[in-house]
Amino acid sequence: MTNYIKSEFYRIFHTKALYIMTGACLMVVLLFLGGLWVMSVFTVDFRWATTKYAFSTLEADMHIPLYLSAVMGSLMVSNELKYKTFNNSVAFGIPREQVFLSKVIVGMAASAFCLLVTETGLISGGYLLLENSGAAYTLSLLKGTAACIPAWIAGMVALMSLYYVTGSNNASIWVWLLIIVAVPTVVGILGMRFGFCARLASWLLYPMVSSVTPTEEWLEFNWSTAAGFLKCQEAGVIGISLFIVLGIWAIRRREL
């Protein structure tokens, strides 16, 4: 398994797609910060060029990395069945479970690289270009990131699992959007009327990372409290576990 993990590390970290994705994420963040700075220079009394506004705005968009987790999952397994690379791995005697788990491990490492670069650029750029609102908003952003990481990993593993279930890049993406985004969104809407749906939605990944409640002070997120933070972690770990089980089941039944 170690050798296969090394080969996957080499493959993913020597492909342009990872660096294009990371660069695009960093560029979007810097353009956002740069736009706020430009507005503060050319607009009188522009009050949004602060780290409070910038960091809180991006903390309110934690569902965007969930979509990006599907992109990362696709990078890890894209066209593997089409070009028979999965067949070659199995033919060399690598157990199917190890193939899947190795891709999960390397996908987590690649995701960590992308996240580290992007968040470092965000925080550094925020302090360089914008008015410093204090450490509280930086810590809140970091706390939100930590709370959502398990959910993002679950999103990546879900795409990888669905690829082996469907055998198609396009089909796996559509099914991912259905079960990760569409169905939980509908459940969340029904939760406005039915208590059971509200309780169920509170454990689903997409509503959990996208829920934002305006307050008198500023914004409140699911992870703002200790109990909410723990619940986000638990939901993410449950999602990871379920989709790993699904992925192993699917890869075992996949014909060569």
Question: What residue ranges belong to the model's regions?
Answer:
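Transmembrane helix boundary and interhelical loop/hinge segments in multi-pass membrane proteins
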Residues: 73-92, 96, 256
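Aromatic- and glycine-rich beta-strand/loop motifs that create alpha-glucan
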Residues: 1-26
